Amino acid sequence: MPIGVPRVRFQYRRDRSRVWIDIYNRLYRERCLFLAHVVESQIANQLVGLFIYLGVQDETKDIFLFINSPGGGIISGFAIYDTMQFVRPDIQTICVGLAASMGSFLLVGGAITKRLAFPHARVMIHQPMSAFFETQTVEAILEAEELLKLRESLAKVYVQRTGKPDWVIAEDMERDVFLSATEAQSYGIVDVVGVALASKG
């Protein structure tokens, strides 16, 4: 049985009364955003709006994007990525479970030196799949050309942000490549692997 979204008490500034709001709403106010779904247009629009709002609200404080996503649409992923580069605050990206496909692309898109993976996180990169349209023959050719352009754009970002040679990225994108947190750090997708807190007592 689903437990629903937990609610927590919150007090607005200049208001003594407290209200109950869902935990994600509360965390958004602390500049903590979550990508815990397939990347698609609705999720992309929500994140784009939140990035812009938080960027305007305070240009000096970092924004935290927690990622646990199997990936999703290329265009939606680029919309999120481009907004991350557009806003003034640094975006700290944190992989808390799985960052696959467009999830790993957004993970690598965080501010350099501020990309983190939890110790048991997994990262997967691969080339974009054909998922634009139900195609006929001519449309399939046009789609293949568009996918090739998008693949080149993805590869260019990975090269710039990991420091890997373009031939390494091109070769690894030919198949599903799964990486542990430490392997993702060595690859240049993340900068830091989070460590567990020391046990109490």
Swiss-Prot record:
Methyltransferase found in the keyword field: no
Transmembrane segments: none
A UniProt-annotated Pfam family: CLP_protease
Keyword terms of this UniProt record: Hydrolase, Plastid, Protease, Serine protease
Catalytic activity: Hydrolysis of proteins to small peptides in the presence of ATP and magnesium. alpha-casein is the usual test substrate. In the absence of ATP, only oligopeptides shorter than five residues are hydrolyzed (such as succinyl-Leu-Tyr-|-NHMec, and Leu-Tyr-Leu-|-Tyr-Trp, in which cleavage of the -Tyr-|-Leu- and -Tyr-|-Trp bonds also occurs)
Locations listed in the record: Plastid
Any one GO cellular component localisation term in the record: endopeptidase Clp complex
Taxonomy, superkingdom: Eukaryota
Active-site residues (renumbered): 101 (nucleophile), 126
Main location: plastid
UniProt GO BP: protein quality control for misfolded or incompletely synthesized proteins
E.C. number(s) listed in UniProt: 3.4.21.92
Function description: Cleaves peptides in various proteins in a process that requires ATP hydrolysis. Has a chymotrypsin-like activity. Plays a major role in the degradation of misfolded proteins.
Record family assignment: Belongs to the peptidase S14 family.
Name of the molecule in the record: ATP-dependent Clp protease proteolytic subunit
Species of provenance: Cuscuta reflexa
Gene for this chain: clpP
